A protein has these predicted regions:
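An acidic- and aromatic-residue-enriched active-site/binding cleft used to recognize and process polar
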Residues: 11-12, 136, 144-145, 167-168
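A polyanion-binding, active-site-adjacent surface
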Residues: 1-138
Length: 201
């Protein structure tokens, strides 16, 4: 499975620091008017053993690295559990995938970003550039909101397979819904088996 080029897209970053809210609650300020020193000042570090380099909240390594502070959350463990069967048993399956969050302005902890048009525009333009640089075969969204904002740009990448699934931490990951009568977990499992790795052929 390591020859497959897969880009995984989640939804939002979060910040737990109230010091950052004056910046992140104003999109134009966040993207264009905040001095770098202010942004650097609100990047938080969690003290988890000696692996501080993997624990920065805004660093995606905190989510995809085996020792990352967010790695055991359902948002990532539910995805990992389905991916790992396709990669060597002693390997982290996320080593073979790229991943990041669609929205680039953090939300307050556990709150929706409350995105503005500028958030959607910058997020979509950024993802287009990421796709052009990484040239993935598959782009998988674990955020229907993010997918809806990006789907009109799919035509610019005719060789890329795009697919959206429900968020791995929401109730529909394990609960059947829709015309197919499948859970998000089963839909993702079928996609991996039938479309990506062709193990059902």
């Amino acid at each position: 499975g390591s020859d497959k080029k897969i880009l995984l897209i989640w939804e939002s970053y979060y910040t737990t620091s109230s010091k950052s809210w004056d910046i992140i609650n104003f999109p134009e300020k966040w993207y264009f008017d905040s001095p770098q020193a202010d942004i650097d000042g609100i990047k938080e570090f969690a003290k988890v053993k000696e692996k501080e380099e993997y624990c920065r909240h805004w660093n995606f390594a905190s989510k995809m690295h085996p020792k990352g502070i967010d790695r055991k959350s359902r948002t990532f463990s539910n995805v990992e559990n389905l991916l790992k069967k396709y990669f060597p048993k002693d390997k982290n399956p996320f080593e073979f995938c790229a991943g990041y969050n669609f929205y680039l302005r953090p939300a307050e902890t556990s709150k929706t970003i409350g995105e503005k048009s500028i958030d959607n525009e910058i997020a979509a333009k950024t993802l287009k550039e990421v796709i052009r640089i990484l040239t993935p075969e598959y782009v998988v969204f674990f955020s229907k909101k993010s997918y809806e904002e990006f789907k009109d740009y799919k035509k610019e990448f005719p060789t890329v397979v795009f697919k959206a699934f429900t968020h791995p931490a929401c109730r529909w990951w394990n609960k059947a819904y829709g015309k197919e009568g499948q859970s998000g977990k089963d839909r993702f499992k079928d996609f991996l088996e039938k479309k990506v790795f062709n193990t059902m052929a």
